[in-house]
Each structure stands twice: as structure tokens, then as C-alpha cells.
């Protein structure tokens, strides 16, 4: 039935596509606000630890794409593809400087034999950071980077699921203040704009979600995985970075909790979900 989806399989993943970060990120990555300079060497170490958690610790097959110095934002792979089941939508990122990032991602997803759909419409923009998939439906943030036409193409691509749009007034993306922390659990920041967006999502949906409210909007961006033999796994920001939000995550007794630092990439709007595209490939029987 449309919109119902397959919640039982939510969070399952066999592969993660990531991309190394270029030196050019330090000076040339897009950022919503001027601030501290990125320590690129430290950003690289944090990124390597993140990739290590997905691969070595959790056993996903990691496909690591090389950095491209002409694409300073290319480490943020989430924005260039939305993958659901065996279908991958190659997006048309809202920032023109990021459009060429899709090429290498498309190639990688073709090698994984996914069904590829490309967003060709020049009136459409969509960043994957604006796409929240709950396992039952999609919410798409309408932001500076994602427009209505982009949301319509996503809805056409994933016809089995309901798609609702949510205005994003503050913050770069919808997932700058929310994400899924479990099969039925939305992690949400405490700001007025985050709470307003949650209210809209609740009104749009036929389903009642549980919510996990954290004090810091940025810390509401986490990665939930359902890993065989490990169960519920949650990557969240460290207590050193966001102590009060970490305390909220620590109350999730059914989850294997893995704190991960992202302080350097955060300076250029990078959050945990931004740095991977997670894929659940069916095992050939």
C-alpha cells in the first residue's frame, strides 16, 4: 500500500558510499556563516574515524570515492543522491558549484547495480540533506537548496511512498535540525524553527512518530542503523561537542551508541548524515 513502506527493514544497510575530503575544502567550501577556519588535517582525521565506524566497526562495505580539488564540498555525498531500496535518485544540487559532484556518485551507484534516475529538469533543485526518509514516507525540506520541482521529481521516483514538503526557514537543510534516531523515532532540535517543522510533519503524516528532543539543533542530526547481530545502532555527536544533547541520547537504552566527532566539518555546515550515502543491497539468492 502506498505510503506504508517496509518499516521492519528500516535502518538496514550493507554498503556506504563516502568521499575523501579535498584540501580545497578549507578555503573554498560553501558555508552559511563566516566563522572559524577549518583545520583540514583534523577534519580528515575525524572523517577517517567516521568511515572506520561504518566499515570496521559496523561491517558495512565502504565504497570510498577520491577527493576532487575542483569540488571543495565533495565530501558531503548525501546531497547528490537519495537511495531507497534498489533505486537511486541522482539529484540536482541547489548550489551550482556542486553540480559536477553527481558524476562520480552516479558511476559508483551504477557499479552497485542500482536503478538510476537522474534529475534532468533545469528548474529542479534538490539536496539530499533536505530529504528525511522515515521508513514509511518522505519529508522534503523546501529550503535555499531544494525547491518544489525537486520534491515532485522525488515523489515521481519513489511512487510507493507518500511525500510531503516542509518549509525550512532557518538552517541550511531539513536535516540540519532533525533526523531518524530509530524505526519510529524522530530526533528533533529545540529551536522554534525545528519545533515548527516537526509540527508540520506531524500534521502531514497519517502516522504517529515518537520524538526525541535534544537541546542543540545540530546534534539532532544522527545516523540510525539496524545491523544484524548488533541491533539498533546510533551514531551521534560526542559529549565533548554537545554535552546536553549527548545526555539525551544516552537515555536510549536499546541502542548501541557510538559518539562521533564532526566539529571541523561542522564549520562548513557538515553534519553526520552529510558524509555518507547508505545502501541496503539485497543479497543475491
Swiss-Prot record:
Could you tell me which PANTHER family the record lists for this protein? DIMETHYLARGININE DIMETHYLAMINOHYDROLASE (PTHR12737), N(G),N(G)-DIMETHYLARGININE DIMETHYLAMINOHYDROLASE 1 (PTHR12737:SF17)
Q: Which GO terms describe its molecular function?
A: amino acid binding; catalytic activity; dimethylargininase activity; metal ion binding
Q: Which Gene3D superfamilies match?
A: L-arginine/glycine Amidinotransferase, Chain A
What name is this protein filed under? N(G),N(G)-dimethylarginine dimethylaminohydrolase 1
Taxonomy of the source species: Eukaryota, Metazoa, Chordata, Craniata, Vertebrata
Query: Which UniProt keyword terms apply here?
Result: Acetylation, Hydrolase, Metal-binding, S-nitrosylation, Zinc
Q: Where is the active site?
A: 173, 274
Coiled coil start-end: none
Q: What class of enzyme is it?
A: hydrolase
What Pfam families does this protein map onto?
DDAH_eukar
**Which EC number applies?**
3.5.3.18
The UniProt record gives the binding positions of substrate as 30, 73, 78-79, 98, 145, 268
GO CC terms? cytosol; extracellular exosome
Amino acid at each position: 500500500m502506498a505510503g506504508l513502506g517496509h518499516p521492519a527493514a528500516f535502518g538496514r544497510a550493507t554498503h556506504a558510499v563516502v568521499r575523501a575530503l579535498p584540501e580545497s575544502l578549507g578555503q573554498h567550501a560553501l558555508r552559511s556563516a563566516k566563522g572559524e577556519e577549518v583545520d583540514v588535517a583534523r577534519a580528515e582525521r575525524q572523517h577517517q574515524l567516521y568511515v572506520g565506524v561504518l566499515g570496521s566497526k559496523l561491517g558495512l562495505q565502504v565504497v570510498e570515492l577520491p577527493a576532487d580539488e575542483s569540488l571543495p564540498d565533495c565530501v558531503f555525498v548525501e546531497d547528490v543522491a537519495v537511495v531507497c531500496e534498489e533505486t537511486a535518485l541522482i539529484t540536482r544540487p541547489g548550489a551550482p558549484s556542486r553540480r559536477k559532484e553527481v558524476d562520480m556518485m552516479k558511476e559508483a551507484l551504477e557499479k552497485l547495480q542500482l536503478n538510476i534516475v537522474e534529475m534532468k529538469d533545469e528548474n529542479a533543485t534538490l539536496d539530499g540533506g533536505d530529504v528525511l526518509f522515515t521508513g514509511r514516507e518522505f519529508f522534503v525540506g523546501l529550503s535555499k537548496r531544494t525547491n518544489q520541482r525537486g520534491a515532485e521529481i522525488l515523489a515521481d521516483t519513489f511512487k510507493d511512498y507518500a511525500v510531503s514538503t516542509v518549509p525550512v526557514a532557518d538552517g541550511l537543510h531539513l536535516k540540519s535540525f532533525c533526523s531518524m534516531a530509530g524505526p519510529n523515532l524522530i530526533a528533533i532540535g529545540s529551536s522554534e524553527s525545528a519545533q515548527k517543522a516537526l509540527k508540520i510533519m506531524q500534521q502531514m503524516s497519517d502516522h504517529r512518530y515518537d520524538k526525541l528532543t535534544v537541546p542543540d539543533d545540530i546534534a539532532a542530526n544522527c545516523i540510525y542503523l539496524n545491523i544484524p547481530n548488533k541491533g539498533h545502532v546510533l551514531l551521534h555527536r560526542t559529549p565533548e561537542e554537545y554535552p546536553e544533547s549527548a545526555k539525551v541520547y544516552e537515555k536510549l537504552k536499546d541502542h548501541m551508541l557510538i559518539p562521533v566527532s564532526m566539529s571541523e566539518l561542522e564549520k562548513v555546515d557538515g553534519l553526520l548524515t552529510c558524509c555518507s550515502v547508505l545502501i541496503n543491497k539485497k543479497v543475491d539468492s
